[in-house]
């Protein structure tokens, strides 16, 4: 029951690799050029602000004693494995869903790298309106969010619409 990898959704894992490279590179640049919590305004609603998150999205569980590092690392590994199995079971022509899975995997692995190497996820994208700041995030978070939106979008497509999206292969 072995299938050539190029005929499966795993063919799209290159996108996950690109996300990991861009995410880790951008975080390394920020860590090399910013002190922790240093902020540089770029435009009236956006700063580059170096922050660390010991929890998950919106600093969920960030105030715990450290066990959450391994908990979230396990979740990232588990989700990545499940999505890779789903990609293997799909065809390479199912571009939308495979790209979505690859974005989520790339984001999960980018943040996993931070958790394992730095003990926390490094964030630096800071959007705000007046004094209200959206939680600081990074490129891995952007990839995960886009991937999740694409999964939801794909779920609303009819089979005919899915065929039209995936047709040009």
From Swiss-Prot:
Its main location: membrane. It comes from Yersinia pseudotuberculosis serotype O:1b (strain IP 31758). One of its GO terms (cellular component) is plasma membrane. Pathway: Protein modification; lipoprotein biosynthesis (signal peptide cleavage). It comes from the Bacteria. The chain crosses the membrane at residues 4-24, 29-49, 70-90, 101-121, 137-157. This is Lipoprotein signal peptidase. It catalyses: Release of signal peptides from bacterial membrane prolipoproteins. Hydrolyzes -Xaa-Yaa-Zaa-|-(S,diacylglyceryl)Cys-, in which Xaa is hydrophobic (preferably Leu), and Yaa (Ala or Ser) and Zaa (Gly or Ala) have small, neutral side chains. InterPro entries: Peptidase_A8. GO terms for biological process: proteolysis. It is found in: Cell inner membrane. One of its GO terms (molecular function) is aspartic-type endopeptidase activity. The active site is at 123, 141. This protein specifically catalyzes the removal of signal peptides from prolipoproteins. Belongs to the peptidase A8 family. PROSITE patterns: SPASE_II. Its EC number is 3.4.23.36. It is a multi-pass membrane protein. Keywords: Aspartyl protease, Cell inner membrane, Cell membrane, Hydrolase, Membrane, Protease, Transmembrane, Transmembrane helix.
């Amino acid at each position: 029951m072995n299938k050539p990898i190029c005929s499966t959704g795993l063919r799209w894992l290159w996108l996950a690799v690109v996300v990991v490279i861009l995410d880790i590179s951008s975080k390394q640049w920020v860590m090399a050029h910013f002190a922790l919590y240093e902020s540089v305004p770029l435009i009236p609603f956006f700063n580059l602000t170096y922050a660390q998150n010991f929890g998950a999205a919106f600093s969920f569980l960030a105030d715990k004693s450290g066990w959450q590092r391994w908990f979230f690392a396990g979740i990232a590994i588990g989700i990545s494995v499940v999505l890779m199995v789903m990609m293997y079971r799909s065809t390479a022509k199912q571009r939308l869903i495979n790209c979505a899975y690859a974005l989520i995997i790339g984001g999960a692995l980018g943040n996993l790298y931070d958790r394992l190497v730095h003990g926390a996820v490094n964030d630096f994208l800071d959007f705000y309106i007046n004094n209200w700041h959206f939680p600081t995030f990074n490129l891995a978070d952007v990839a995960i969010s886009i991937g999740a939106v694409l999964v939801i979008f794909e779920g609303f497509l009819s089979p005919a619409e899915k065929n039209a999206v995936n047709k040009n292969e």
